[in-house]
C-alpha cells in the first residue's frame, strides 16, 4: 500500500486514482496525520503531495519529521519535493519565472524511477517556487527550461517538481508506477473483483443475521451499495425507493426493472402527492431543498418503522465514497457551503442504527467498476449524475405537476438526441432547466407567450470543475426544433455556455 500525505493540492486525489488504476492500493491522509496512525497502516512507500503554500513561509505545512524514521521510500511532488529539499538543508526560493502548464522534461541521469520513460516528454507544471540548491547527497535526475532540478534523488528519497498524476504529464502514470512497483516493492493486487470478494465476506461477518435498511435513489452509488449488500445478506436487506414525483421521465420504471433484473426486492413508496403539496407556493432554492430533505426523512421514517416492527433493523447503509471521507479531514478546513446536499442525514433518534458504508474506500469511477463486476448493466452505470432533490432544482421558481411534465418531456428529448448522435457518453452531464420566464413567440399565425427552457451539457472529470460542452449548432437546432414542436408550453430553447467556476453545474 502507498500512503499519500495531502498538503492541500487540487490534484491530490488524482495521485491515488492513478495508482489504483495501475492495481496499486493507495490511501490519502492529511499531512498532519500522526506517526502512530501512519505506522499502523504499514505503507510500503509515502508520497508527499503538492500544495498551495511555500516551504519558507511561517505557516508552511510540515509533517512529522519522524516519517523519515519509517525506513520506507518517499516521493515528493511539487510542494512535496520542495519540503524535502528544505528539510534536508537545500534552498527553495520564489521563482522569477513561475511555471504553470505544459513544459518539456529532459532526463539527465538514469534512475529506476525513469525506467522505460522517454528521455524527453511533456509534463504539467504548477508552481511559484523553485529549488536553486540541492541538499548534500541529492543528485539531479531531470530538468525543464525553467527548473534546473526538476527531478531529484537521494537513495530511496525522490522529488518531482512537476505533477505526474495529471493526464497532461505524458509519462506520469509510468513514473508513479515505477515508484510503487520498482522502488517500494508493491504488487498489483487492487481491483474490483478482489474488493467485491473481500467486502462481501466482511459484510457477512459484520451483519450476520441482522437487517439492513438501504435508501435507493436510483443513482449509481445507492444501487451498487444495495447490490453488494444483497450479495452478502440476501433478504435481510430492506431496499426502499421513495418516488417523490420529481424524477426524470420513466425513471421509476427504469429503477424497478433494474432491481428486478438483479433479483433484489425493492419497496417502492409513491409519495408524489406529499412532496408536491409541501412544495406548493415555494420558489426559493434552499427552501425547496430543505422541504424535500425533511419530507424524505418523514416518508422514509414511516416506511422504516413498518419494517422495524416486523423485525429489528440494526444497520443503515449509505453510499459514502472515498472523496467524502478525504474531505471530512481536509487540510483546508471546512469550506463555505454553496448548496446544501440532500441526504438521509438528520434521521430521528429512534433510528439508532449502526452505519454501514461499503463504498467508503472507492472513488466514483471505482464504484462504477464495482457495479459492473456485480452485474449492474453498463447503461445504468453510465447514467449522468442526478441531484437528490430531482427536477425541483431544475425548475426555477415554484414547482407544479404541469411544470414537471413539461421538463420531463424536454429533458427526455435532449437525452434521446444525445444518445442517437453518440454524444451521451462523451459529455459528463446533460439536462434541461425550465426557466421561470416566459417569452413571446409565433406558432403558425398565432402569437404565443410561453416558457423558455435551457439546455445544459458539461465536460468534467469529477464535477469539482466543469466546462460547457461544444455541441454542434446543427445538433442544437435539431433538439430545439423537437422540443418546441413536441412539448406543449415551450416556445424558446437556449444553451448554457457557462463553465464552473464561475457558475455551478446545476442552476439551483
Curated annotation (Swiss-Prot):
EC numbers, comma separated: 6.3.5.2
SS bonds (residue pairs): none
Enzymatic reactions: XMP + L-glutamine + ATP + H2O = GMP + L-glutamate + AMP + diphosphate + 2 H(+)
A Pfam cross-reference name: NAD_synthase
Keywords: ATP-binding, Glutamine amidotransferase, GMP biosynthesis, Ligase, Nucleotide-binding, Purine biosynthesis
Regions crossing the membrane: none
UniProt cross-references to SUPFAM superfamilies, sorted A to Z: Adenine nucleotide alpha hydrolases-like, Class I glutamine amidotransferase-like, GMP synthetase C-terminal dimerisation domain
Limits of the Glutamine amidotransferase type-1 domain: 1-189
Sequence positions that bind ATP: 217-223
Keyword Oxidoreductase among record annotations: no
Pathway of action: Purine metabolism; GMP biosynthesis; GMP from XMP (L-Gln route): step 1/1
Function recorded in the entry: Catalyzes the synthesis of GMP from XMP.
Protein name: GMP synthase [glutamine-hydrolyzing]
Organism: Helicobacter pylori (strain G27)
Gene that encodes it: guaA
